[in-house]
């Protein structure tokens, strides 16, 4: 029932996120981003024998970790897929509209960043891949080899908020005419050369690597498709907790939750009672939560994390 001991990797905002779900021992919960199972493990600790946890992730290494840690726990069920498939999974399992909580921990897990072969990080050299699912889709190297300068510049500016997007895109196109871009260190050095001055405490490739990863994994397209499904899948009183790691994601989550909480204003003159709104599905729970100093001392990557919580209305 308890699963195997958790690995050294610790999920960001672990206690805060699980606390926000207000886990009931007999509840049904869904972890849309299993990663290495930090949040799932804590949810299972709070579930009783009649509780259920469904976890999703498109990373084959996450699937292996799920089997290793929780494969013998009858309360746990894993599906290898993107969280945009959430409703298909819950429909098939017969739990749509019955979920007591959904957790989304967006972005890249620390083990993914720390594995050079995955190609997410410029801190060590590896193949320029960046795919959450390395068995499908187009790698970062393949995209950079075919995209034109305008497309690359747009991605760097829109997804990475990179002020030197055009300079970097031009350098990428010039360089690939002489040699293929296939390694993370190769790309990081190219970007560092293209950026005219450096920000303190931030590698010049940080924004570009983020932007390319978002493009390769279609992250800002899949997120709204996932969010739109969730209100109808929650039971009344069910909670949604979302952890985002950069401003584009957080703005998207904040806007979605606000719109669901405010609903649609009805035209003046209609005979309605109370607040003249319809379509309200969620209520906001508290303010946005950020990591405390103790967690930041242990995990500096938590600095940009923001947790937002909402609850399904009856």
Curated annotation (Swiss-Prot):
GO cellular component terms listed in the entry, alphabetical order: cytoplasm
EC number(s) per entry: 2.1.1.199
Predominant location: cytoplasm
Keyword match Transferase: yes
Gene Ontology biological-process annotations: rRNA base methylation
Residues that bind S-adenosyl-L-methionine: 37-39, 57, 83, 105, 112
Gene3D superfamilies per record: Putative methyltransferase TM0872, insert domain, Vaccinia Virus protein VP39
Catalysed reaction, written as an equation: cytidine(1402) in 16S rRNA + S-adenosyl-L-methionine = N(4)-methylcytidine(1402) in 16S rRNA + S-adenosyl-L-homocysteine + H(+)
GO MF terms, alphabetically ordered: rRNA (cytosine-N4-)-methyltransferase activity
Keyword Methyltransferase: yes
UniProt keyword terms in alphabetical order: Cytoplasm, Methyltransferase, rRNA processing, S-adenosyl-L-methionine, Transferase
SUPFAM superfamilies named in the record: Putative methyltransferase TM0872, insert domain, S-adenosyl-L-methionine-dependent methyltransferases
Pfam families: Methyltransf_5
Annotated localization: Cytoplasm
Enzyme class: transferase
Origin superkingdom: Bacteria
Family under the similarity heading: Belongs to the methyltransferase superfamily. RsmH family.
PANTHER family referenced in this protein's UniProt entry, alphabetically: 12S RRNA N4-METHYLCYTIDINE METHYLTRANSFERASE, S-ADENOSYL-METHYLTRANSFERASE MRAW
Its biological purpose: Specifically methylates the N4 position of cytidine in position 1402 (C1402) of 16S rRNA.
NCBIfam families with a match to the protein in the record: 16S rRNA (cytosine(1402)-N(4))-methyltransferase RsmH (TIGR00006)
Stated name of the protein: Ribosomal RNA small subunit methyltransferase H
